[in-house]
Amino acid sequence: MDHAEENEIPAETQRYYVERPIFSHPVLQERLHVKDKVTESIGDKLKQAFTCTPKKIRNIIYMFLPITKWLPAYKFKEYVLGDLVSGISTGVLQLPQGLAFAMLAAVPPVFGLYSSFYPVIMYCFFGTSRHISIGPFAVISLMIGGVAVRLVPDDIVIPGGVNATNGTEARDALRVKVAMSVTLLSGIIQFCLGVCRFGFVAIYLTEPLVRGFTTAAAVHVFTSMLKYLFGVKTKRYSGIFSVVYSTVAVLQNVKNLNVCSLGVGLMVFGLLLGGKEFNERFKEKLPAPIPLEFFAVVMGTGISAGFNLHESYSVDVVGTLPLGLLPPANPDTSLFHLVYVDAIAIAIVGFSVTISMAKTLANKHGYQVDGNQELIALGICNSIGSLFQTFSISCSLSRSLVQEGTGGKTQLAGCLASLMILLVILATGFLFESLPQAVLSAIVIVNLKGMFMQFSDLPFFWRTSKIELTIWLTTFVSSLFLGLDYGLITAVIIALLTVIYRTQSPSYKVLGQLPDTDVYIDIDAYEEVKEIPGIKIFQINAPIYYANSDLYSSALKRKTGVNPALIMGARRKAMRKYAKEVGNANVANATVVKVDAEVDGENATKPEEEDDEVKFPPIVIKTTFPEELQRFLPQGENVHTVILDFTQVNFVDSVGVKTLAGIVKEYGDVGIYVYLAGCSPQVVNDLTRNNFFENPALKELLFHSIHDAVLGSQVREAMAEQEATASLPQEDMEPNATPTTPEA
């Protein structure tokens, strides 16, 4: 046996011993001395806020322009190769995705390239994540497309008598204008939220909500891409039940499908599925994932151009990709009142997706991202990008994993990827004009695999949390059938309602003691745990406030089995039986327990003033129930103390304080003490502010821990028993008993 094993102490023999006083709240406060806090005046705070120092200026620049912090510290020899490989790998994936997601956004494909260039450059300056890939994202693109199609439907009549069927260019120009307006407004919203430090809004989009939402969005994207895969001409729908209408329209026109288009799409679909499995299986051995999407684009373009699929077989292709960058244009702000709901949804969803992926990769690589600065960065990318005719962007999950997985160290990898897109925009775009839309459709559908795999969340949430399962399902169903905008609003409302439900219907437990320890556990969970005679310990795992205060009081009486009203009723019934037996009607009308103190705040008995000293009535007056009446009472446990475990209560509002005061009074009326154990300083402050301690004696009901309250209760009962014994008259003592005197 080695030295470590010789010195190892078995867990069952490890002990700790503590000897200290029983800490009620007043006793503990006597042992503590509050630290003096230096409070700054408003003038000092303003002076400090507006004081300009070089360090403060530098920190502001670092915060608003993170590139000024990480670029000077760039380790060229260590980072450049990884950023180079990552940038190329991300760029070859960004090209087909930019073209494909433009189709989802209902704008010409070249605008997908613009959206893959401008925002990426801007994010490099303002973003705090080193690894995410900014640009078009399927869900956001689909939401943009929904707005564009709603305001500019396929069958719109353009002013001047040009029908949309024959005026595709005019219709697309209007849709671009709508997309620019939505993008500008969503960017302004994101920027303002970031400046106001509202980065915390992402916490309201819980993981089940986001995953249910993106899964529903994947179904929307899938149905939107079917028409391109089958090569059929159908109207594009948006709004409520759009996914149903789109599916029905494709199925009704399936007899007119283009076999050549379907064949090319399925070929690319199979290639991508098999290739991605290969990449996943051999990712440890491959220096970088095989750029399958880029190969699919090259192969599809080559086959289409070689066999002249567009002219010979009527296969829809990308079409003209004009070379060069468009000059800046002002978005149409007059559309804001028509798109503000969509802009809010796009702003929040885009930020939520971005910050979740950014935090995941940041935790993996050991750095931090700033949610507020991410909002500002996205706001700048969208608002300024809209001037250059881009549509709303976000973090692409698939590209981010590629950018990080291929060795990317900084956002210079993203800049390199955007430069590859710029090369296509300026010089080589015409090479992809023959690319079949079915190929882009297959690329999009294959990249939805990860989102469809989120259906596996359902059995997990079924096992772990029915509430989170409810959030997932309601988000999915509402987003699927109501549309992504109203579905998101519905999902957020449902998620907030579950928070209220959890606090309104928390778990209530009656605790017992693990024998010979100060450990108190749920008595229903373990056989070894036993209740302490005469004491009930009641626990709640939520705050006590207006929504659950009445439920708390009811649960206390139900779970502990100690109901003051029933106790009072039983005693009065015993009095009536006794009166009937002895034939004294006056006894039946006697008061069983008289308590002069009232602590509910409304009917409180006013304290008496005597010699300028305020005297409060006692909290609990213990009265002796005549022994001759005991036989008329139902047999049961004689509870003398109820301990409320507040270790998991983080606040109490005014309604909750009144409820607690009522509980103390109600139990006090039948001679039962109510102790509060484990109150946090916040809860004590809540009780103090709401005048719970108007009677100073109530502070004696607060204890530092459950064990302190238990010991305090036992000491109190022991002292009361000694006093009762000492007060017995001499004739009640045993005949031969000799009074003892304490030793000197």
UniProtKB/Swiss-Prot annotation:
Cytoplasmic domain ranges by topology: 1-75, 127-137, 197-206, 283-291, 368-370, 407-410, 465, 505-744
Self-association and partners: Homodimer. Interacts (via STAS domain) with CALM; this interaction is calcium-dependent and the STAS domain interacts with only one lobe of CALM which is an elongated conformation. Interacts with MYH1.
The name this protein goes by in its record: Prestin
Site (Controls the electromotile activity): 398
SUPFAM superfamilies recorded: SpoIIaa-like (SSF52091)
NCBIfam families, per database record: sulP
Gene null: resulting phenotype: Homozygous knockout mice lacking Slc26a5 have no obvious developmental or behavioral abnormalities, except that, at one month, mice show small size difference compared to wild-type. Mice show loss of electromotility, shortened outer hair cells (OHCs), and a reduction of hearing sensitivity of 40-60 dB.
